[in-house]
Amino acid sequence: MNTIQGIQMIGTQRSGSNLLRVMLDGIREIVAPHPPHILQRFLPLLPKYGDLADRSNFYRLAQDVCELVTVNPVPWEGIAIRTDEVVASCRQQTLYELFRVIYESAARQAGASFWLCKSMKNMLYAEGIESTGIRPYY
């Protein structure tokens, strides 16, 4: 498996999208963990991290994002998100790149060809998501 494809689910509250996410997660080729809402939670906080071109600032952000995934109320079972590995896999020092690497890592660890994120607010961040090279199915 060389290519991992993203799927960004666009749902609304009380629409049944979480049930669909759980059903899709049951397909071996798709990993669809409960969303920790990485972009929604961290984009407003980015100014607190300073210049992300500074490796230490980016690493601190990566640690916090990885911790968010780790303490997500619904665990990502069988998936280990390690800050050092995530940072080493990043091609850019951006929050969007952390998002990409974390979801692709989850897919690799699950042996899946697709990852699915059901974070509803991500539709507002499509341009940033796609700036990493991700061309998700919506």
Task: Please state what every model-predicted region is.
Residues 15:
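ATP-binding Walker
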Residues 18-30:
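A conserved segment at the C-terminal end of the G1
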Residues 29-34, 135-138:
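Short hydrophobic/aromatic-enriched beta-strand-loop microsegments
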Residues 118-121, 125-138:
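Conserved phosphate-donor/acceptor-positioning beta-strand/loop module used by diverse small-molecule
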Residues 9:
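Hydrophobic anchor at the beta1->P-loop junction of P-loop NTPases
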Residues 33-117, 121-123:
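PAPS-dependent sulfation machinery
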Residues 3-6:
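Pre-Walker A (Motif I) flank of P-loop NTPase domains
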Residues 12:
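Short, aromatic/basic-rich helix-turn unit that serves as a nucleic-acid recognition element
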